[in-house]
Amino acid sequence: IKTKVIKNVNGLNFFIRETCTEKKPSNTIVLLHGFPELSYSFRFLMILLSKQGYHCIAPDQRGYGETRSIKKEKTSNFSIVNLSKDIFELLKKLKINKYHLIGHDFGSYVSSYITLLYPQCIISLTIMSMPFGGPSKKANINKLATINQELRNLKPKRKHYQYYFSSKGAESNIMNCRQGLKNFLRSYFHFKSYDYPHNKPFKLASFTASEMAKMPEYYIIK
């Protein structure tokens, strides 16, 4: 696996991982990681796919890993439309006009939007661990805000994990956690894995705070 930085792409210096076993590969696969992950997450899959003759590219997305913003970031830069543009512009700079997309977790969301916004570029789309329900509506955003308030009203209080990770204190809490960052991340990924015995999927009866409180604590935090 080779690594490189592609400079001046939609305001970013993009760090990518790349594999290719053929001089003139017929197909490119772009792999987009989720949260909290990096392009490194795809290292084994990239090698497997490259042995099948595919040219594989996995970037660290905006805000992750070794990818750096050229100027100070604005919150608006992280809109789903701009995150999709990041990848489109990256592939355009690499002179790759058509490609397969594989997205995992939040990378699935970005991949789905790329497919909607730039369908002329997409050969195929594969998404994992995050179903795509279509473009978000304002009503859905308002509903999420209501759910977060209802979670706070529960006893004990709860927080949705996305709400927590976007709060001001989250970074400091994680970086300075009692067990150390490495052990925190190892535990976090283990608790979300198939190997963890208490992970038993079930369907929620409704989109309400009381139902969501039944979810594992790495999703709905006490």
Identify the role of each PLM range:
Residues 1-3, 14, 22, 28, ...:
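Flexible "cap/lid" subdomain of the alpha/beta-hydrolase fold that forms the substrate-access gate
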Residues 36-44, 56:
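Serine-hydrolase catalytic-loop signature spanning alpha/beta hydrolases and amidase-signature enzymes
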Residues 44-47, 51, 116-117:
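Short, well-ordered alpha-helices that flank and scaffold nucleotide-derived cofactor binding pockets
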Residues 31-34, 58:
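Structural cue for short, hydrophobic secondary-structure segments
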Residues 48-70:
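Conserved alpha/beta-hydrolase
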Residues 9-19:
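A short loop-to-beta-strand scaffold at the N-terminal edge of the catalytic core in hydrolase folds
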